[in-house]
A protein has these predicted regions:
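Short, low-complexity disordered leader/linker segments with a strong preference
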Residues: 1-30, 142, 324
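N-terminal (or domain-start) structured segment
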Residues: 22-116, 154-156, 162, 178-203, ...
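An extracytoplasmic/periplasmic, membrane-proximal ligand-sensing/linker region
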Residues: 30-32, 175-176, 216, 223, ...
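Extracytoplasmic/secreted proteins, especially bacterial periplasmic and envelope-associated proteins
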Residues: 47, 51, 55, 77, ...
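Hinge/capping helix and adjacent helix->loop/strand transition within the periplasmic-binding protein
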Residues: 84-90, 104-191, 240, 245, ...
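Short secondary-structure boundary segments
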Residues: 96-97, 134, 208-209, 227-228, ...
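Short beta-strand->loop
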Residues: 112-122, 158, 180-184, 202-203, ...
Length: 324
């Protein structure tokens, strides 16, 4: 009798919770939603976040979706703030590759990427490319590797910033090809591209959209794309993966929220975001950024993030990369 009483009580509790959770998801959001952007206003991630916020607000009947720009410490400032927010789905981080790379190079983060966050949805990806100064002799990955192997000094390359996705793409090439290259640090894509165009640095891993106008102008040349397939607007140029199997490097924006958010809320958030980013309105407003807009489920994003973290940990360890 006692056991049946316990079972009955548990069933009543479950029945009492389920409608409440469903109601919570149906009513979401019940207060302003805040999207934390780990960069200053005006950059590509900020622009994507503002377009997303505007269209999410419209989908939610005009309920406010606010942008909080919190740059600093290689995105750690904003990430730590979100990690400590109430786990109710009303606070989200507009995550970039740094969310996955930082754990590989910094072992004293004020948060645990895998434990302190719940995945919501991808927003968009951008392909990465290896480009070179127009006067640099090699024009393919194989020729770059051959040049590096015969050069008495390591080849220099650059990226938009140290310990970012472009930097680690170069480290991955070094490891896969067995060559020596030295990363030249810049603070941002624009100054790095300027010096590659000027011939001060021969090679650069950058977002294809950022480098493309220089390639189109004949100031740079595309060595290879780091995406799964050849670029639609440069289909004559091979991918990195055609030489080194599995060599794919993608810049991304995704949404994560503090761990512990109710599952029905996560599912509603993800479904609404997927609906927005797949809409013609969102794609029309973001097409000038050169992004591939798409969403996925919390489970899909979480699985992808785990794979990416493991990959960057392997690359960073082999390169002995550590945060300052």
């Amino acid at each position: 009798f006692a056991m049946r009483s316990v079972v009955f009580a548990l069933l009543m509790t479950a029945l009492a919770v389920s409608p409440s959770q469903a109601q919570t998801a149906a009513d979401f959001p019940t207060s302003p939603v805040r999207l934390f952007v780990p960069f200053a206003a005006g950059g590509p991630t900020d622009v994507v976040a503002r377009i997303l916020a505007e269209q999410l607000s419209a989908r939610w009947g005009g309920k406010p979706v606010l942008i909080e720009n919190r740059p600093g410490a290689g995105t750690i400032v904003a990430t730590a703030l979100v990690a400590k927010a109430p786990p109710n789905g009303h606070t989200m981080l507009v995550a970039t590759n740094s969310l996955l790379i930082n754990p590989a190079i910094n072992h004293s983060l004020p948060y645990d990427t895998l434990k302190d966050f719940a995945s919501v949805s991808m927003i968009a990806t951008q392909p990465v490319a290896l480009v070179a100064n127009k006067s640099f002799a090699p024009s393919t990955v194989q020729e770059v590797v051959a040049e590096a192997k015969k050069s008495p000094a390591p080849l220099n390359y650059t990226s938009p910033g140290p310990r970012g996705v472009g930097h680690l793409a170069g480290e991955m090439l070094k490891q896969r090809a067995g060559i020596e290259m030295v990363h030249i640090n810049y603070n941002g894509s624009a100054p790095a591209l300027t010096d590659v165009v000027a011939g001060r640095v021969p090679l650069m891993f950058d977002i294809w959209h950022s480098a493309k106008r220089y390639v189109d102008a004949g100031q740079l040349k595309l060595i290879a794309g780091a995406s799964a397939e050849r670029f639609a607007d440069a289909s004559n140029v091979a991918t990195m993966a055609e030489t080194y199997s599995g060599f794919q490097v993608t810049a991304f924006n995704a949404l994560v929220t503090p761990a512990g958010a109710p599952q029905p809320v996560l599912e509603k958030l993800s479904a609404d975001i997927r609906a927005v980013v797949s809409s013609d309105a969102f794609r029309e407003k973001t097409k000038h950024l050169g992004i591939n807009a798409y969403g996925n489920t919390p489970a899909e994003l979480s699985a992808w993030m785990r794979t990416e973290i493991a990959r960057w940990q392997e690359v960073a360890k082999a390169a002995n990369l550590q945060a300052n």
